[in-house]
């Protein structure tokens, strides 16, 4: 009887399936480094995935923060190229690991587990948002909660974004919690002082996860203020803004102390105003990533996304517009709460245009646009509920199994195919084997490389503000290598060529002091150069 009752409400079973897979991924992924870009193993390497290259920058700073109590990268270099709140959360994990004598591999496993539970909590909050949008009917509230929960935790694209290890999961959770909290405002005709302080604190902490959340908050407060009783809401919105600003201002003080500017070094490295040459490329990526998010990443092959998405939206159009009772399903939402959701939509949509105009890092666009899921997933779940509620039970079960099946197909193809994603996972092992700590290694991509090798210094400016000073002082990167006594350069061949080997006069000057390292890095993309006369480790035999 209990089992039959459990099957009627299968959410606990599905949570167990999700957690079982996620914990297997965290505990049984391999330590060490792959020796090639394809390996004979169904489990990934911790140095490669699910935690990714860019997350290892934050993990390095978090590890150093726990060890040395300072926000620094390798060589005790003060840095601003992080998202502060998630770094401090990770630093707590790192401190516990160090206290108990653990190593960096254990630290990575804990970060994965943390983000697995963050996604689970996010699913609960999004489900709670969906419940609040449904008036009165408790059974219907549970159904939309259940659907929202399932399409959140079994969304492989979202799972991979969250377990990548950056601030994304925690950031989405805080935005969702902020959105959920505002739905409580509909119960009060007058917004109270206490609500302003709580909401301001919540949004201030969200700002410490991504500073550009300020754009979203500003958009929401403008919509709220212009709605009605403008004078009262202006005072309330100003109190929210001041509370949030009070929370984030210490971070800006730190950034200014380290760099003399208010923009973190990672922002300077990624920012570049769009021009005509970039226009089509950037907005093509925008289109692909928005489609990917809206189709819940069910389609992995990039070239098929636009075609499949067109078919997907055509089906939606037919169901919701030709069959009016499906379209009207969205009209039954609680009117006042729907109004607040609409404010969030208006606040989030500008992200689609702001990021491609001001930021060149197109590989981050999916992460930048992911806050759209906060309002999209609950609304989609409500629409799916209306679509499926009168269908046979087998049809409803089969529809849910599609999401679960696509999740595990994505997981198998991405994590368990034996394919290495990040060349730096191979390069990190190569550096550790070939260059002891007395060598100082420079690289533009130092996420994985710098986390596992403390003798690596960042050369692209994400973590190292000195690189941005070179442009201000009109100095070359080669000058910086000399000044910092860097003996080894490891990076993709195209980056080395662009920075040091083009044009010919620059190549001649560089090769006068540097030579190719005789041992090849087995990833097929990364090359290594060493000084002809090293500043350090002069007696190391493999160097000569």
Model-inferred region functions:
Residues 1-544:
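Membrane-proximal envelope and lipid/glycan-remodeling enzymes
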């Amino acid at each position: 009887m209990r089992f039959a009752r459990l099957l009627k409400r299968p959410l606990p079973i599905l949570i167990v399936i999700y957690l079982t897979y996620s914990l297997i991924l965290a505990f049984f992924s391999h330590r060490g480094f792959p020796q090639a870009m394809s390996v004979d193993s169904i489990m990934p390497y911790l140095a490669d995935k699910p935690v990714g290259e860019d997350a290892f920058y934050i993990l390095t700073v978090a590890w150093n923060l726990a060890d040395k109590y300072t926000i620094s990268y390798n060589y005790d270099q003060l840095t601003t190229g992080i998202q502060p709140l998630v770094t401090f959360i990770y630093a707590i994990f790192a401190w516990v690991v160090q206290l108990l004598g653990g190593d960096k591999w254990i630290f990575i496993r804990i970060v994965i587990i943390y983000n697995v539970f963050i996604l689970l909590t996010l699913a609960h909050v999004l489900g709670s948002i969906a419940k609040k949008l449904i008036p009165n009917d408790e059974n219907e509230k549970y159904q939309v909660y259940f659907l929202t929960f399932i399409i959140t935790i079994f969304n492989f694209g979202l799972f991979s974004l969250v377990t990548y290890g950056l601030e994304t999961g925690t950031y989405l959770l805080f935005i969702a919690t902020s959105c959920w909290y505002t739905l409580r405002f509909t119960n009060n005709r007058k917004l109270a002082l206490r609500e302003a302080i709580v909401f301001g604190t919540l949004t201030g902490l969200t700002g410490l996860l991504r500073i550009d959340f300020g754009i979203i908050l500003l958009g929401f407060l403008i919509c709220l203020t212009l709605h009605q009783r403008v004078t009262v809401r202006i005072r309330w919105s100003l109190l929210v803004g001041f509370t949030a600003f009070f929370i984030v201002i210490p971070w800006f003080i730190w950034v200014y102390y380290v760099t003399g500017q208010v923009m973190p070094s990672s922002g300077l490295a990624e920012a570049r105003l769009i021009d005509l040459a970039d226009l089509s490329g950037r907005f093509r990526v925008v289109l692909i990533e928005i489609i990917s998010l809206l189709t819940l990443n069910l389609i992995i092959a990039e070239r098929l996304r636009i075609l499949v998405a067109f078919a997907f939206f055509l089906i939606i159009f037919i169901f919701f517009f030709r069959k009016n009772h499906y379209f009207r399903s969205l009209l039954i939402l609680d009117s006042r709460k729907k109004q607040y959701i609409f404010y969030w939509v208006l606040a989030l949509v500008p992200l689609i245009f702001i990021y491609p105009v001001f930021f060149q890092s197109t590989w981050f666009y999916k992460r930048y646009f992911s806050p759209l899921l906060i309002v999209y997933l609950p609304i989609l779940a409500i629409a799916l509920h209306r679509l499926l509620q009168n269908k046979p039970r087998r049809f409803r079960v089969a529809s849910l199994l599609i999401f679960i099946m696509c999740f595990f197909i994505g997981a198998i193809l991405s994590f368990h195919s034996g394919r290495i994603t990040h060349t730096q996972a191979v390069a990190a092992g190569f550096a550790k084997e070939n260059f002891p700590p007395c060598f100082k290694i420079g690289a533009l991509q130092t996420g994985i490389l710098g986390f596992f090798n403390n003798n690596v210094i960042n050369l692209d400016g994400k973590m190292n503000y000195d690189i941005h000073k070179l442009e201000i002082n009109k100095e070359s990167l080669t000058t910086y290598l000399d000044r910092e006594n860097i003996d080894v350069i490891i990076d993709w061949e195209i980056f080395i060529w662009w920075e040091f080997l083009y044009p010919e006069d620059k190549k001649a000057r560089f090769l006068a002091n540097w030579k190719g390292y005789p041992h090849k890095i087995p990833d097929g993309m990364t090359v290594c150069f060493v000084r002809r006369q090293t500043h350090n480790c002069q007696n190391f035999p493999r160097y000569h």
